[in-house]
Every structure is written in C-alpha cells, then in structure tokens.
A protein has these predicted regions:
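Conserved Switch II/interswitch segment of TRAFAC-class P-loop GTPases
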Residues: 40-45, 72-82, 93-155, 168-181, ...
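Glycine-rich, flexible loop/turn motifs
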Residues: 23-31, 38-40, 48-51, 80, ...
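A ubiquitous short alpha-helical element
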Residues: 56, 126-130, 238
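Conserved metal-binding segment of the jelly-roll/cupin
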Residues: 70, 359-360
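Conserved G1/Walker A P-loop phosphate-binding module
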Residues: 1-111, 139-140, 145
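Amphipathic alpha-helical transducer elements in NTP-driven molecular machines
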Residues: 32, 46-49, 62-68, 82-96, ...
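Structural motif
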Residues: 352-357
C-alpha cells in the first residue's frame, strides 16, 4: 500500500519525506527538485512489539511497513499538462492515499510559488487540478456507459452514480465528500478517481507554534476545511522533525522531552497514514521472531493466516488468540491460558488490531 506525499513547491514535503524515510531525496529551495517520485519503505511504529520483545527476547523484531512516495510539486494547470502535470497526475493515480503538505508558517527566506502564504489557496490549487482530471475521467466513463446502455439497461445504475459524482465535482468539491452506498461504490470502483482517495493534511508550522499549534490561525483554517472531507490534520514542524530524524535512542528522547512531545510528529503521521489506508496489525510472538503483520480492517482469520503462508490459509483449522493487553497483564502465555484468556476462533472470526495469534493448520 502506497501513500503519495503531495504539495506545492517549497512547502516542506520533500524534507518531510527525507525525514520519514531517511532516504535522502534531493531537496532544494526551488520548484521541481523532485521529478521522478522517490519511494521509501517505512516501518510503522508499534510500542507493542517492544513490550513483546521484552517478554520473548526474540532473535529479531519485524515491524509492519508502508510505502511513501514523494511526488513532485503540483502547480495550476497540471490537469492540462502544465508544469509536468501529466506526469504528476499519473504518479498520484498509482498511490492508495494522499498526504498533502501545506505551509502554515511565514519565512521571508523561503520563497512561495504564489508569493504569499495561504494554505487554503494551496489546498484548492491542488484539489482543483485533481477535480479537473476527475471530471475528464467521469465524462469518458459516462460516454462509454451511455453507449452500453443501448444494449443493456443495467448500465443505467452506473450512469446515475457517475452523474451524481460529476455534479459534486463541478461544484469544486472532491468525490470523497459524497456519501455513496456499497452498491454505488462497487459500480465505480474501476473509475479510479483521484479525489476519491483518502487524504491526510499535514500543516507545516514554525518552531514557535510547536507547544500550541491550535493557536495558529492558518492551522485552524486547514482544520475547518478538512472537516468537510472527514479528513485528519496533523500539525508538525518539519524543520524540527528533520533534526529528530537524525537522532537515535536517548538523544531523540531527550530532544522530544525538551520540546514537550511524547512522540515525534512523523511517528504520528506514519500511524495516521496506516489507519488512513484502512490497515491494522495482528501480531505473532515467539523466540525466533516478534512480528506485526499488515491486514485490512475486517479481514477474517483464514485470510490473515495467508499473510504468513498460503499453506496456513489453505489448511486453516483454528486461530488461538489472546489480546495484547491480556498477555501483558498476565506476563506470559502460560498464565494467560490458565486464566482462560486464550480463545479458539474459527473461519468466520474477524481479526482485531493487536490480536496475538497462533494459527493451527493441516495440509
């Protein structure tokens, strides 16, 4: 699963990408310093793995991972191919969710592509380009569906949904703001609309706003805008995050304490991104390895077993499950079993985040 980091030139998105991935994507104070998207594979922070590692002392600990793609800065006219626009839009099509970085700080030394700091204008600039691209996509699908309607009346339902979406897009709103039924979503699932992708907004703030980001009027504006899309906003100072990313262990902990934070803003971004993708983790624990496995929310036990090995899914008998909280409270799997806290679940069991599992199977 991939998240695309987007933003206008010079808002801090490549610096954030560098900090998240430590991949050293080229970063400079001029537009288009990222042309081909840089891709970084990032471990998802999970304190539960640290606790299990203390209990099992495993040979290795493996985190769940997600991919971030740093997509070059979009500009007005991208949907018409301006500013390498076609390339940018094709890169956005390839990601599952969007992380949009907006600038919420003043600094005369960092140029803004539009000459002034206005995060709502920046959001609109990008969203309108995505909306224009979606209108073009919807029009093509409508033409096709109307031709097919002559031979098969079932296409009327698809036409109805597409026209409903087009109306909202033409009002300058994203497709994700529309309430659609599961049936309607199914009808347009192959339309791949850019503004249907889930979105997370990153408000890049100054160091002086770290203690109380809510006092920043620009952040408030972004939060108000995001409400309509049921989107989350994470304020963070990307400059400070870059410093934090260069530190390890105690040094990082000391700096976090000095600025009054429990965890880095980037850790919050990664966790929120994982959730945005509709993902969660189940855990396996033993002396060889403590590991988090990525699954979609709503996944049943046999499908989760298949993440480990296809043979386990094929020969699934049952899943022996204990919750993370119960295991930590009791101190060992033996104690948890004695208390009756280890459950036996069958094929219809829907996995929960943090389930610690041993799959029984036979092939």
């Amino acid at each position: 699963m991939k998240l695309g980091i987007v933003g206008l030139p010079n808002v801090g998105k490549s610096t954030m990408f560098n900090s998240i991935t430590k991949a050293g994507a080229e970063c400079a104070n001029y537009p288009f310093c990222t042309i081909e998207p840089n891709v970084g594979v990032v471990p998802v922070p999970d304190e539960r793995l640290d606790e299990l590692a203390k209990m099992y002392n495993p040979e290795k600990v493996t985190h769940a991972i997600i991919e971030f793609v740093d997509i070059a800065g979009l500009v007005k006219g991208a949907s018409k191919g301006e500013g390498l626009g076609n390339k940018f839009l094709s890169h956005i099509r390839e990601v599952d969710s969007i992380v949009q970085v907006v600038r919420c700080f003043e600094d005369p030394n960092i140029v803004h592509v539009d000459g002034s700091v206005n995060p709502l204008r920046d959001i609109e600039t990008i969203n309108l380009e995505l909306i224009f691209a979606d209108i073009e996509t919807v029009d093509k699908r409508l033409d096709r569906a109307k031709k097919m309607l002559k031979a098969d009346k079932k296409y009327q339902a698809e036409i109805d949904v597409l026209e409903k979406i087009k109306k909202v897009l033409e009002e300058g709103k994203s497709a994700r703001t529309i309430e659609l039924s599961d049936e309607e979503k199914d009808l347009i699932k192959e339309t791949y609309l850019l503004t249907m992708k889930p979105i997370l907004y990153i408000a890049n703030i100054s160091e002086s706003d770290i203690e109380n980001p809510k006092s920043n009027e620009l952040v408030k504006q972004v939060e108000e805008y995001a409400k309509a899309e049921k989107a989350q906003v994470i304020p963070l100072c990307i400059k400070i995050e870059e410093e934090l990313a260069s530190l390890d262990g105690e040094d990082k902990k000391e700096m976090l304490e000095a600025i009054g934070l429990k965890e880095s803003g980037l850790d919050r971004v990664i966790k929120a991104s994982y959730d945005l993708l509709g993902l969660m983790s189940f855990l396996t624990a033993g002396e060889p390895e403590v590991r988090a496995w990525t699954i979609k929310k709503g996944t049943k036990a046999p499908e989760a077993a298949g993440k480990i090995h296809s043979d386990i899914e094929r020969g699934f008998i049952r899943a022996e499950i204990v919750s993370f909280d119960d295991l930590i409270k009791e101190g060992s799997m033996v104690a948890a079993k004695e208390k009756g806290l280890v459950r036996s679940e069958g094929k219809e069991y829907i996995m929960k985040d943090g389930d610690i599992v041993l799959f029984r199977f036979n092939v």
